[in-house]
Amino acid sequence: MAQMTSGLYPMFGFFICLLFLPASWEAGANTFQELQKTGEPSIFDHLLPLTPGLTRRALSDHKNSGQHPPDLPKSTATQKPKRQCNTVRLVKPVHKPIDDAKAADYGNTTVGHEPFPASEKNLSSQGKHPMARNERSADDHGSTNSEKRSDGGHSTSAPMRKISCKPVTRTSGTPVSSTETSTKLRTTSQKPETSSHDSDLIRKSTSLPVKSTEVSRTSYRTPRSLGAERHTIPFTSDKSIQLTIEHTKEATRSQSTPTKYERETRSASERISRAHVPPVENHTPSAGETTTQVSAKSTKHTEEATTSTTEKATKAPERPTVNLNTTGLVKAMENTSTAPSPHLHKTETAHQGITGSLTSRMDLRPITSEAHHLQQNTHSLPGGLHSVQEREGSNSFPAWAIVVVILMAVIILLIFLGLIFLVSCASRARHQLTQNSEDAEPEDKGGRNSYPVYLMEQQNLNLNQISSPP
């Protein structure tokens, strides 16, 4: 047992070490990535400095020989994580001469570019950090800007070299291939013939910003004459200028057209106002004739209204108040309709007189008709107004109240019938009980099991021989 326990302890410690090793490796890799993002130098930079001169020599030797570099010896034990640096040579695009016809097609500042190989893009995207990628993209933009600023000097620019480092953990049985990646990048970077499709795409992408800059230049050169612009501006910018001029002309025409519509609307409104004028003037004499007739009739109706009852007098002043409001509204509408025309000042007074007479006629007719009906009712009925009021009061009783009263009466009747039935049942039961009691009394008096005989037998007999009572 002691040997088993002594063997288990080292095994347990070994497993714990195996568990902690991946965690420590991940922590070290994270710290190196953070240092690489912030740009702070780490301890391993001082321990493993890379000389760019040696890498350049190795690259040139491998290029001339055309052979792969020898594999490095395999490490037999796990080592601490180190930063593996990949030297990448970014070859700037070379300026090439272009004919005048091609320059006219692409613009005054178009330049032939040598594309970056596709293999270099893939390898750099796999092995480089995002910060290094951003630096490379910034350099690419800087190179394109420098090409645009150049006035046509055809000179090959020197290739740029960059070092992108990343942390690498070396374990047992894994060879380190830093020089292989650098030589592959070098050898593949000088084969632009294999990526012809990519070169066309890059040329198209580089031609787009050139066109955009030319359009922006035309916007600044607009004050100049059109002849000078035709010599300096490309074909695309001429189209844009012509389109803008046409749009401005159309906008000015669209702004000038509403004036025609306004004139038409004004003329139409004047015609409408003129059309409204003659009917009013034609109807004025007939209205004057009707006013005299209405006034004559109104005097008769007012005399009849005074002889009516007190209710007639209370109803009569209520109606004219409502009609006065309507007359005010009619006057306001007439004033608004006749305001535009200056020739209708005389007709307004006639309208006011007509409306006053018409409203008086409309007011007096219903009043007199109601008074006449009330007089007929009072003369025909024996009870007079009191009987009419009583009928109105009786008719005002709601129907749902009648239904409720009927239901309550039915319920009371049912309760009364139930009480009668219960009383009869109780009386019958009591009668039966009285008859049974009367039948049992003679047997108790003259029977064999009477009270004194039972007592005598109980005294004479023993306790064991006593018979139970029936």
From Swiss-Prot:
Cellular localisation: Cell membrane; Cytoplasm
Matches recorded under InterPro entries: MUCL3 (IPR026623)
Region feature Disordered, mapped onto this chain: 57-234, 248-318
Residues exposed to the Cytoplasmic side: 423-470
Residue ranges annotated as Extracellular topological domain: 30-401
Basic and acidic residues composition bias: residue spans: 132-152, 194-203, 260-273
Membrane topology recorded in Swiss-Prot or TrEMBL: Single-pass type I membrane protein
Glycosylated sites: N122, N325
Superkingdom: Eukaryota
Keywords of the record: Cell membrane, Cytoplasm, Glycoprotein, Membrane, Signal, Transmembrane, Transmembrane helix
GO cellular component terms attached to this protein's record: cytoplasm; plasma membrane
Bilayer-crossing regions: 402-422
Biased composition (Polar residues): 75-87, 169-193, 204-222, 283-295
Presence of keyword Lyase: no
Annotated signal sequence range: 1-29
Job description of the protein: May modulate NF-kappaB signaling and play a role in cell growth.
Name of this protein: Mucin-like protein 3
Gene name per UniProt: Mucl3
